[in-house]
Amino acid sequence: MRKYCILAVFCCLSYLAAAQSPVEKGLESINRTSAEAYIGFLAHDELQGREAGYHGSKVAAQYIASLLQAMGIQPLGDSYFQPFEAYRRERQKRGRLEVHPDSITIFKKEVHQKLSMTNVLGIIPGKNTSEYAIVGAHLDHLGIDPALEDDQIYNGADDNASGVSAVLQIARAFIASGKQPERNIIFAFWNGEEKGLLGSRYFVQTCSFISQIKGYLNFDMIGRNNKPQQPMHVVYFYTEANPAFGKWLKEDIKKYNLRLEPDYRPWDNPIGGSDNGSFAKAGVPIIWYHTDGHPDYHQPSDHTDKLNWEKIVEITKASFLNAWNLANEKEY
């Protein structure tokens, strides 16, 4: 009798697993344990604040690439890495860094500082190889300030290890779904955002298929509570000309019982704030998840113990559904 009971339970579980839709399989793979692991590594003191062009951000890039490879995500090109250089023409330290495919050649006589950086780019090829969706977040932060007396490391747990964790989990969720998307979907990790959106700007400047990108989904700071009375509050920016982006989230929250409380902010010209600006300026529709500022913004006190893990997981699930729509919906 016991054998029959065990067999019945096994058959039932097998049926339930088989009955799950690809989207549900992807959602099920998103969890707090992974968020804690990814953010914990990226925001560790050993990464020295992940300043673009320096050791910590290079370690972060290698870590992210190794995870993409382990998941089975292909590199976008011959490598997961897209190297680029930024330059500063002014002699003063405060001079703005610039990026251009031929920047050093063009401004060679005027360059007084050069930084070498790397974006990390992976792709799941779609059935329709002529269209793209991109999911991205910046991997860099502010590094170290030796002038500070106590904590000198800007760990950047919320800004933006939290966003990187979401992109990684979404990439894994697409693999877990077991279904090839209709469009190519790129998973992008930008370097140099804190120095002027350098990595995303370089990508857009050099992208041969920019007009074929149907949408860009951005994450920048998704782990804190700026409204204690609303712990699941999140700001949801999206291109106003694409009302489907707002409709999707409203429908998905209801359908999948997500506990987010979005502040919907359609934006007629979303060219500021984060890496979404690089794409919006090129005419690409955008979505941007953001949980607003807080007292630890751009401070050494931006640590993992202050994150709302439940919110990070819920945002990641909601945004996976956004990405699924970007990659699979015929029209929007």
Predicted regions and their residues:
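Bacterial Sec-dependent N-terminal signal peptides
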Residues: 1-22
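N-terminal capping segment at the start of a domain
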Residues: 22-24, 29-59, 71-81, 85, ...
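Second-shell loop/turn segments in exported
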Residues: 22-29, 45-55, 70, 106-111, ...
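Structural recognition of the beta-strand scaffold that forms the well-ordered cores
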Residues: 39-43, 82, 119-121, 132-136, ...
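A non-catalytic alpha/beta surface segment that caps or lines the substrate-entry region
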Residues: 50-123
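Alpha-helical metal-binding/catalytic segments enriched in His/Glu/Asp
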Residues: 120-122, 131, 135-141, 145-196, ...
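His/Asp/Glu-rich mid-to-C-terminal helical/loop segments that flank catalytic regions of hydrolases
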Residues: 176, 293-332
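Metal-dependent peptidase/peptidase-like ectodomains
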Residues: 190-291
